[in-house]
Amino acid sequence: MKEFKRYLELDRSQQHDFVYPLLFQEYIYVLAHDHGLNRSILLENADYDNKFSLLIVKRLITQMDQQNHLIFSPNDSNQNPFLGHNTNLYSQMILEGFAVVVEIPFSLRLISSLEGKETVKSHKLRSIHSIFPFLEDKFSRLNYVLDILIPHSIHLEILVQTLRYWVKDASSLHLLRFFLHEYRNWNTRITPKKSSFSFSKRNQRFFLFLYNFHVCESESIFVFLRNQSSHLRSISSGTFLERIYFYGKIEHFVKVFTKDFQDILWLFKDPFMHYVRYQGNSILASKGTSLLMNKWKYYLVNFWQCYFYMWCQPGRIQINQLSNHSLDFLGYLSSVRLNPSMVRSQMLENSFLIGNAIKKFDTIVPIIPLIGSLYKAKFCNVLGHPVSKPVWADLSDSDIIDRFGRIYRNLSHYHSGSLKKTSLYRIKYILRLSCARTLARKHKSTVRAFLKRLGSELLEEFFTEEEQVFYLTFQKTYSTSQGLSRGRIWYLDIICINDLANHE
């Protein structure tokens, strides 16, 4: 990043943040190929890894440098005058390099906007669990929530036009259009599915950048409203940069609706409005009434359709009351429930019992999705009965036990924020018995014999760090489940959710 910053600071008045020349630098492709920059992408192209070399990079740069213009033929996808015979390999390398280059202006502006602020120093904000303490603190005071499926069916050409207001380099935008029109097998619209995106595996970084940019644009109305309201102040809003074009659209949007709905513009200054985005969904929670939430729903649908040309069906935004609705949120079922309590009040010789209900944010671990994940990974059948893992039978006994134990510790680590650990005990039972069945299958023995042989050794592998400390300290007095079933812990080192289906 220092090299990028040094380049962009060279004669900035003439460069105007031009990033296109960086495509002719070898280190860009090395960085793009570095797995350290692609840690979040689970699916990688092994065939591309085998073909990558600096010699091919130099050959590609030489070939690009000799071309005066880009020419593409939609009728002949195998050979392109610009890319040559190695269309697939070269195009993939250019596209991955382009994905790195186009992120540079955003990264530099983000760093400059956060200079001197505490937000940039707090790496713990990256943790998925960091959102749950916020929900615990805020949601217990709120009444309604908008459960929003972020509109995603947007034409890629609209993304290119929107990107113009961030990237001033016309050459880079022309190259982006070139790629989008070159490959007819790419979808012309970004269409994320329920839990994953239908992006090409070899070009995930590029399309993830486009999708994240699209989401940032579609939700930037909330940043504008928070900045315009004197009641709402947010440190995180400093990470979004002012854009004259966008704010011009917002001002026009407000003027249009002011003419007809002056009496309800106060909803923009709701001091109890909170917004959270996760994966392809978002949550907008408020202390207001259902009428207020219906107005928000109406404004969001019209804003996305009129100013981002995205068709958003009203059914994609659900209005729910927090007191009787559970949110399926990042592997937890989160809800706000009433916790009744009785208070005795005594005046002289008379005493009274006063009932008091306190709202409390509650999180539980849904057992059915977890069993479904274990079933996909072939640790159990569809009913949750443990089965052996034949593909691991060739490993050593210690490796088999370590793999099963590590999976449970990861699951327990992630779901440590639940007060009720019953679901985790069920998962531990499935994984322990699946481990025993795998070992018995390997040695052609019975499960009973292996459980009798391993005993405490197998048990210790399925202890988390907290359980190990508790077990060693209070081994003779209390059971582990009694001491740990009442605690809630949020870890600030979790940056991703492990998918058991991909754990082979």
UniProtKB/Swiss-Prot annotation:
Transmembrane segments: none annotated. InterPro entries: Domain_X, Maturase_MatK, Maturase_MatK_N. GO terms for molecular function: RNA binding. GO terms for biological process: mRNA processing; RNA splicing; tRNA processing. Keywords: Chloroplast, mRNA processing, Plastid, RNA-binding, tRNA processing. It is found in: Plastid, Chloroplast. It comes from the Eukaryota. Pfam families: Intron_maturas2, MatK_N. GO terms for cellular component: chloroplast. Usually encoded in the trnK tRNA gene intron. Probably assists in splicing its own and other chloroplast group II introns. HAMAP family: MatK. Belongs to the intron maturase 2 family. MatK subfamily. PANTHER family: MATURASE K (PTHR34811:SF1). This is Maturase K. It comes from Actinidia chinensis. The gene is matK.
